[in-house]
Amino acid sequence: MGTVTWEGVTLSAGSASSGSSPSAPATFAFRFCLNTSTVRDEQGRSRPLRELIRIAQQAGYEAIEPWTHEIEAYLSSGGTLPELRRRLEDAGLKVADLIGFAEWIVADESRRQKGLEQAKRYMDWAAQLGCPHLAAPPVGATGGTSPRDDPRHSHPVTDLLAAAERYHALVELGKPFHVVPLVEIWGFSRTLRRLGEAFFIAAESRQSQAAILPDVYHLYKGGSDFSGLPLLAPTAIGIFHFNDYPDIPRDKITDADRVFPGDGIAPLRQILKTLKTLGYSGYLSLE
């Protein structure tokens, strides 16, 4: 197989060199990852990590993107992080990113400090698993639009410079672990709902490692179109959540309406071409 084409876009980075065998495997422009929330059971519950590893391996993914509560459950059942890393390595899988919900962005200093301690714990887990990234969504500052937030204490952050300083502190926290937090866009949130907001926070954080976590559905939900993506450097994208959405207005669509790539109306061809032109060669994570 020399190349793979999807949605009219050739996903291989280039043909084999003249000295290579014609049957040499293609070098793909992107890598492929499974966000573990994609394969929850019929009740919406997470599956055990052992099962998630098997699913990802059998489907041919290169990496998984587990949620921290799944790791918590694994540890509570008697597993250890070194053992989990061995399981992943035996399956030929990497951990591309951890999905956690630490309140790093909130204005309340006491809550933010607790959030940073929680983030530090997640970063330690990530480091032990060889994972380079931790998702940093605006949990606690969605304006009560997330079930993970207490609506009595969930206030939007409108001062993006202040948010950039809080992200600076979060990046500093990750440096001893060699784990970079990713500014994650949540389209339903009243904080960090647009591509420009995430980019502003990363750009003004005074951190050269700063990076963001875009998501096809969340960009649509939050009001961004995809014409801003060419402004990004490939190193500014830590991982890209890949999905699709049906023809539902932004103000009515919900997370539950997300569909598999190709089953909706998102301009995936445009997005893939843009990412390839940028030189992004990281993970597309199915969520």
Language-model features: locations:
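N-terminal export signals
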Residues: 1-19
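Active-site acidic/histidine proton-transfer and metal-coordination neighborhood
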Residues: 6-8, 24, 46-54, 82, ...
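Boundary/entry segment of secreted carbohydrate-active catalytic domains
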Residues: 24-46
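Short, well-ordered coil/turn segments that N-cap beta-strands
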Residues: 26-32, 60-62, 89-96, 128-133, ...
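Conserved, mostly hydrophobic/aromatic
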Residues: 34, 56, 64, 88, ...
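Acidic-and-aromatic substrate-binding clefts and catalytic sites of carbohydrate-active enzymes
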Residues: 40-47, 67-80, 103-107, 113, ...
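Acidic/histidine-rich catalytic cores of soluble enzymes
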Residues: 63-64, 95-98, 164-265
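Aromatic-lined substrate-binding rim segments of carbohydrate-active enzymes
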Residues: 75-92, 97
